[in-house]
Amino acid sequence: MLLTAIIILFLGFTTSVVGRCGTRPPSDTVRALHVEAEVQENAANAQRTLDRPIFISVLNTHFANSNTGFRFNLISQQTIQNDAWVNVVPSSAQELEMKSALRQGRYRDLNLYIVTIENDPPLLGYATFPEQNPSQTIRSLDGVVIIPNSLPGGVAPYNLGLTGVHEVGHWLSLFHTFEPNPNSEPETGCTGPGDYVIDTPAEDSPAYGCPVGRDSCPTQRGLDPITNYMDYTDDACMTHFTLGQGLRMRTLFATLRSFV
């Protein structure tokens, strides 16, 4: 079973959510590449108490249900009081300062930051993809960021903790199921390599709600994978990773994170 570590950093709350995920694409090198986990947590300016072990249970339940080979153990957590870090702007000097100060462990160790995200449109979370030979800056920025209202007990319909599952999927090298072909005009997920996983049906664009029977790529096999954790549907609609996604996560974790 593959091993990694999670460090959860609790930093703030938000009251409105629009965007499901703000994870940015990885380098071309990672795109071309075809797990018991330990968890550490930090938190700042918490406005209410969350049962963070419940969230770790959510991760373990959903990763185990799909036989991914990953399991998460919370090994540390912190509550940080710092007004400058309550609202994090992605890809900002503020984010680098916060993560440089708080990040723990090795490149294989997942640091999870729970904080309000300042972005237009608002985001539920974002993550970093693994890189080959990561620089010190890339190592410092590595991890997953989610807002508190995406955790169990937050604001529906994204309040069952599956934003964290989705973003950890990115941290473990998974793309969106609707990953667009950059060489198409307009961009579409119906052509090109998609998410580089053979057993996820092609999907033209993100799905919202729970549109059963949606088929946005009618010339491709299968209906849209609306119940996959790497789509944008409601938490209650999401049920699984595929076997191919599990294989990709295990392979790239071992290749890019396991010994770093």
Predicted regions and their residues:
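Residues that flank catalytic or metal-binding motifs in active/ligand-binding sites
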Residues: 68, 106-108, 140-142, 159, ...
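Pan-zinc metallopeptidase signature
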Residues: 2, 236-260
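Stable alpha-helical elements in mature extracytoplasmic
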Residues: 55, 94, 160-164, 242-248, ...
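Propeptide-to-catalytic entry region of secreted or membrane-anchored zinc metalloproteases
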Residues: 18-110, 115-118, 254-259
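Active-site-proximal segment of zinc-dependent metalloprotease catalytic domains
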Residues: 100-179
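Fungal secretory targeting signals
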Residues: 1-20
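Structural recognition of the beta-strand scaffold that forms the well-ordered cores
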Residues: 44, 53-54, 71-74, 109-114, ...
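The catalytic-center signature of Zn2+-dependent metalloproteases
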Residues: 152-239
